[in-house]
């Protein structure tokens, strides 16, 4: 037993005690020490650093154990509504004092039609940050690594995600340096007048004067495409949308119909398709009304038309993680992806990852951003560690032959 297991004692050497109970008899073994528990921890860290290791050897606590403890503590705090003073919005400052892109930032960039700003090839999905302190830490780190693009929607968290992201952008004073996709018109509000209403509410939540990119989150087949094109162009004419329009979970046929109408009437059409595209074929819709563009026909159309793809669930929600990590997410998480052809793709990703010195999930993300058309991948890290392990995909260069082989198109 240890007198105080929670805080390493820096003042006195706590004596250890082992209590052994056998056949109803108790034996007490006192373990004398002249060192404080803090000294033991410091020595263990020093030994690990000297050996070039990233964590101390047993019995030191492993990183996974530490993170598990912190995750549990966070869940307890959420349950009782505890927020520390340092986590208050006005106290959540950048770790280095001022927010800036690091000199060694690994991010790469692409171009989206209608935007003067470069757009990071990986885009931060903003649909899971529940408190400002968490969001600010994630987004500060993202920006420092070179990430300048964010994806959010009117429907996420009942508006909470837009509010938190907007507060962070305002606090950091970086509105002109970031690209934020505003999405709306999600079912059942996929009607022209409600699109406009929700768009204005999104800008109000975000505290923005304009949207960089506007994407319709769903389509409504009962509404002629021209009605959507008309209201979107009214927003553009008021300088409320300064870049591209697009559709999420839209069929190619309806997407083309939008552009035919826009061309015939001298208006701006769609240039961004925001469907799922990943190395794993979407076997079942992740959510109702979801559409993928992973199939060969859709990818050929994207290439032939030069349409920009901004892919959601670009890493198939962890399908390419090692089995141990994959199972932590729960088997139900992969019902939308698991199939013999996708297992074969995962096997090929694992094989290629070994050759290229990266992870299979890096191969999965690289597959998306190495397509022969403008292609961006939305990722949804829940922790800074997940961001860090996703970014090596940027350095993975795939040939056209490797892209085809990964999908199974030899």
Predicted feature locations:
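Active-site mouth loops of central-metabolism enzymes
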Residues: 122-134, 183-194, 217-222
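Short, acidic/polar
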Residues: 130-142, 190-206, 255-260
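NAD(P)-dinucleotide binding in Rossmann-like oxidoreductases
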Residues: 1-47, 55-64
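A short, structured active-site edge motif that brings together acidic residues
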Residues: 176-187, 272-277
């Amino acid at each position: 037993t240890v007198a105080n297991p929670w805080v390493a004692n820096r003042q006195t050497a706590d004596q250890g005690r082992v209590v052994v109970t056998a056949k109803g008899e108790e034996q007490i073994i006192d373990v004398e020490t002249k060192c404080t528990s803090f000294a033991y921890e410091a020595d263990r860290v020093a030994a690990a650093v000297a050996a070039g290791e990233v964590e101390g050897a047993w019995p030191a606590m492993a990183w996974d154990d530490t993170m598990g403890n912190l995750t549990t503590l966070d869940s307890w705090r959420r349950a009782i509504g505890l927020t520390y003073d340092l986590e208050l919005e006005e106290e959540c400052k950048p770790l280095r004092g001022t927010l800036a892109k690091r000199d060694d930032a690994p991010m790469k960039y692409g171009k989206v039609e209608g935007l003067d700003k470069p757009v990071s090839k990986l885009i931060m999905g903003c649909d899971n940050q529940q408190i400002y302190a968490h969001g600010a830490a994630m987004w500060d780190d993202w920006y420092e690594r070179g990430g300048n693009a964010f994806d959010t929607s009117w429907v996420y968290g009942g508006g909470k995600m837009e509010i938190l992201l907007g507060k962070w952008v305002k606090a950091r004073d970086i509105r002109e340096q970031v690209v934020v996709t505003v999405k709306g018109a999600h079912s059942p509000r996929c009607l022209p007048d409600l699109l406009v209403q929700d768009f204005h509410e999104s800008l109000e939540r975000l505290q923005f004067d304009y949207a960089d990119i506007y994407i319709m989150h769903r389509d409504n087949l009962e509404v002629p495409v021209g009605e959507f094109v008309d209201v979107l162009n009214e927003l553009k004419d008021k300088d409320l949308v300064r870049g591209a329009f697009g559709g999420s979970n839209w069929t190619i046929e309806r997407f083309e119909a939008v552009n035919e109408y826009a061309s015939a009437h001298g208006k701006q059409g769609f240039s961004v398709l925001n469907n799922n595209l990943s190395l794993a074929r979407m076997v079942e819709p992740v959510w109702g009304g979801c559409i993928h563009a992973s199939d060969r026909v859709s990818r050929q159309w994207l290439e032939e038309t030069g349409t920009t793809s901004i892919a959601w669930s670009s890493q198939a929600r962890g399908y390419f993680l090692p089995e141990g990590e994959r199972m932590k997410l729960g088997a139900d998480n992969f019902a939308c992806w698991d199939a013999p052809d996708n297992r074969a793709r995962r096997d090929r990703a694992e094989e290629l990852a070994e050759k290229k010195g990266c992870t299979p999930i890096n191969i999965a993300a690289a597959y998306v951003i190495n397509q022969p058309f403008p292609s961006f991948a939305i990722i949804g890290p829940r922790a800074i560690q997940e961001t860090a392990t996703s970014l090596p995909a940027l350095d993975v260069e795939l040939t056209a032959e490797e892209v085809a082989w990964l999908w199974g198109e030899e």
